[in-house]
């Protein structure tokens, strides 16, 4: 398959891209082009400014991918800048369990209502993290219902290449 990974040079994106390559997929990564990677000529590269609509349009318009895996969309505008310009058979949005409000011990997928909540186009700095992630999903549910998309909601993401030191923070504060 022809797969576009938006992100993919840091954190668990590295492992994802390597696994996709191992499985024989034709992988393109879309990044700012600032973080070195070890993929060599095994991937195609597209340089983007993720939060700039014109950059996204120029980089993606007219291109087709079987699958787009968007690892770095945070807000509704991030979703729009991909969904309006790239042609794909399936869009996979890496979301977060932060979209659930309230989140509780027995949270299930249907606890999230993407259809009837108040939707706004927004940028990353307009609301706290959980609100911009909700707006990103509201965009998918309300503005792109005819497209084939899925939201993968991670509860907590860690790996051996965690540059955020997220787990270390909790270990040190126990």
How would you name each of these model-derived features?
Residues 30-34, 49-50:
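N-terminal Rossmann-fold cofactor-binding loop
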Residues 3-23:
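N-terminal Rossmann NAD(P)H-binding glycine-rich loop of SDR-like oxidoreductase domains
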Residues 34-42, 84-85:
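Short loop/helix-cap segments at secondary-structure boundaries that form the rim of catalytic
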Residues 54-63:
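Short amphipathic alpha-helix with an adjacent loop that forms part of the alpha/beta core around
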Residues 63-120, 135-137:
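NAD(P)-cofactor binding segment of oxidoreductase domains
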Residues 41-53, 73:
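Rossmann-fold cofactor-recognition segment
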């Amino acid at each position: 398959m022809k797969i576009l990974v938006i992100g993919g040079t840091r954190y668990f994106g590295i492992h994802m891209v390597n696994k996709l390559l191992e499985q024989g997929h034709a992988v393109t990564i879309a990044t700012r082009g600032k973080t070195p990677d070890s993929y060599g000529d095994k991937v195609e590269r597209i340089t983007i400014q993720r939060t700039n609509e014109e950059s996204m349009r120029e980089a993606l318009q007219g291109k087709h991918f079987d699958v787009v895996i968007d690892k770095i969309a945070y807000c509704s505008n991030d979703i729009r800048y991909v969904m309006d310009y790239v042609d794909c058979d399936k869009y996979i949005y890496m979301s977060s369990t932060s979209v659930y409000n309230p989140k509780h011990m027995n949270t299930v997928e249907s606890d999230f209502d993407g259809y009837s909540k108040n939707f706004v186009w927004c940028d990353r700095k307009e609301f706290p993290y959980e609100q911009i992630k909700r707006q990103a999903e509201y965009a998918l549910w309300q503005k792109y219902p005819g497209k084939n998309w899925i939201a993968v909601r991670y509860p907590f993401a860690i790996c051996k290449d965690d540059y955020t030191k997220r787990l270390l923070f909790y270990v040190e504060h126990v």
